[in-house]
């Protein structure tokens, strides 16, 4: 079954793949990395003016990584705003995706966290650097193939 956004994108010949609906009935679409920036701008123009969240996950050990976006179309007087989930799957060997910071400023820390934990590089992000781990940290802690170092820093409790 095709949702309203998917139907709208099909009419305009914009490449995407429908992944169905989640348990809340929110439409989920897959967009290719190379199409992501232009589709993001189109979503904003279409009315998705609120980036609810951005996250990322490791699909499988040695497999793809995914950058996930949840958008809401907030309009005055609407009780049930339209929502959509976008997934962009990336090769583990070179996980690069255009940043949407310049479209939704709230993507700033969220993209940095995905970079810090999974190593996804967001092209044209103004401050893409680690946000949770020290700059000297080696590796990407939330990848399923990550091997944790065999040391733990003991902090003074005083």
From Swiss-Prot:
Main location: plastid
Cellular localisation: Plastid, Chloroplast thylakoid membrane
UniProt keywords, alphabetically: Chloroplast, Membrane, NAD, NADP, Plastid, Plastoquinone, Quinone, Thylakoid, Translocase, Transport
Topology with respect to the bilayer: Peripheral membrane protein
GO terms of biological process kind: photosynthesis, light reaction
GO molecular function (one): quinone binding
EC number: 7.1.1.-
One CC-aspect GO term: chloroplast thylakoid membrane
Top-level enzyme category: translocase
Catalytic reaction annotation: a plastoquinone + NADH + (n+1) H(+)(in) = a plastoquinol + NAD(+) + n H(+)(out); a plastoquinone + NADPH + (n+1) H(+)(in) = a plastoquinol + NADP(+) + n H(+)(out)
Subunit note: NDH is composed of at least 16 different subunits, 5 of which are encoded in the nucleus.
Family: Belongs to the complex I 30 kDa subunit family.
PANTHER family xref list: NADH DEHYDROGENASE [UBIQUINONE] IRON-SULFUR PROTEIN 3, MITOCHONDRIAL, NADH DEHYDROGENASE UBIQUINONE IRON-SULFUR PROTEIN 3
Summary of the function given for this chain in its UniProt record: NDH shuttles electrons from NAD(P)H:plastoquinone, via FMN and iron-sulfur (Fe-S) centers, to quinones in the photosynthetic chain and possibly in a chloroplast respiratory chain. The immediate electron acceptor for the enzyme in this species is believed to be plastoquinone. Couples the redox reaction to proton translocation, and thus conserves the redox energy in a proton gradient.
Protein known as: NAD(P)H-quinone oxidoreductase subunit J, chloroplastic
Native source species: Pelargonium hortorum (Common geranium)
Lineage, broadest ranks: Eukaryota, Viridiplantae, Streptophyta, Embryophyta, Tracheophyta
